[in-house]
C-alpha cells in the first residue's frame, strides 16, 4: 500500500484534503498536530472510504504540535475511540494509550538528526520495546542520506521478523528503503500526494512511485539493479528501464541509491540480493575498484559504468562508449560496418569520460587525436592511449571529420583553456557525450554554425538501450 500524509490546518478543509489523498493513496495518514482547533475526529474518519492512520506528532518528532503533552495524549485517546483503522503512537508513550476496539497500533521510533544504531542489537532492543507496547507495526523515521545510513534497518527488514516494519527514511536513500521494503513485505510505503507537499526534501510522490518505479509490480522475487544517483537524468533512465522491463514481463527493476565508500558495498549488495550496479556514464572509478574482472572489450583497466554479479563474481562492463558510438555511426550512415574507419576523430577532454571515448573510437578504427583545456594532461592521455596529441595552439588548423566533446566542464570562449566557438564549422559532426539529454552551449553553437550534430536525446536513448541489453540480454 501507499500511505499519503495530509496535514490540514483547518477543520473545514480537512475533508477536502482527505478526499484528494483517497483518490491516489491506499492508506491516508491524518496528522492532527497541524490543526489550529480540536477536530471532530470521528467525522473525519468517516469522510472517506479508505483506511485512516491518525497521528499527532511533537516538534521533536517532526510534527507541529504546540500544546502540552497531556493535551496531546488526550487527543490520541479521543482519536482511538473514533476507531480509525490505525493510530501512530510514539515508543515512549505508547503504553499510556491502551488498545481500543479494532484500531491497530503503529509504534513509532523517531530520530530526526541521528542515524540508527550501528549494531543489530540496538535495533532489536527497539523491536522488543515496541512489542511490549502492544505494537502491530513498528515504524522508524531516521536520516538516510546513504545506503550505509539506511543499512541497520535494511539488514533487519531483509530477514523475517515477528512484527512488520515501515520506515520513513529522511534523505535520498529513503526511497531505496521504501522500494526494498516493498520487496521484503512492509505493509505500506510513504509518498507525497504531489510536488510541494513532501514531508521531507526528496520524498517521492505517488506519481513517481507509480510511473517511474512501478512499485506495485515489485514482489518478493523481484531482482534489483542498483543505480548510483538520484538526479533527474538517472531517474529518467530508471523510468525507461522499468517501463521496458514491465512491458517485456521481466521481474527486474532499477533501485536508486547512494553510498559513501566501497568498503562494505559488496557485502550489503549480497545481503540485499542486488544483482548489479549502474554507475555514472563514462566510467565510475568506484565500480572499477569493485570489478573482479572486466569484459574482454575493456581490457585490464578499461572504464566501468556497469557492474554485474555473474556466477558470484562482480564483472565490469562499459556501456557509454559503445552506445555513444552506435549513435554516432548511425548518424554517419553508410554501408560499412565501421563507419568511423579512416575518419579523423578529435576527442576534446582529458578526464575519465574522454579516456572512455578515445578507447571506443580507437576500437572502431577511427583516426583519433586528443586535445584539451590542459595541454599537459591531454598529452599524457594521448601517450597512454597511443593516439595523436593536438596542442591547443594548433587546434584551429586541425581538420577533422568528427569532434567528440568529452569534458563535462567545457567552457566556450576565446580564453586560455576554453574552446573558441569558431573552431566548430561544417562539415564537422559534433557529439557531446557530457550532454545527458539536454543541449549544451557547445551543441547549440555547433548547430547554429551549420555543423552536423548527434542529438543528445539520441545518445541518451542509445545508452539506455545498451544498459537494458547488457542487463537483460534482450533488446529494449
Residue ranges, per PLM feature:
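Phosphate/diphosphate ligand-binding glycine-rich loop within oxidoreductases
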Residues: 222-332, 437, 443-445, 449
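Glycine-rich adenosine-cofactor-binding loop
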Residues: 169, 224-231, 316-321, 328, ...
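Short acidic low-complexity segments
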Residues: 386-400
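Active-site beta->alpha loop and helix N-cap motifs at the rims of alpha/beta catalytic domains
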Residues: 1-122, 135, 142
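Adenosine-phosphate binding glycine-rich loop
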Residues: 332-336, 427-429, 433-476
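Glycine/small-residue-rich loop that forms an oxyanion/phosphate-binding "nest" at active or ligand-binding sites
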Residues: 52-96, 286-335
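Rossmann-fold NAD(P) dinucleotide-binding segment
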Residues: 44, 286, 410-430
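Catalytic alpha/beta core domains of metabolic enzymes, predominantly
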Residues: 92-224
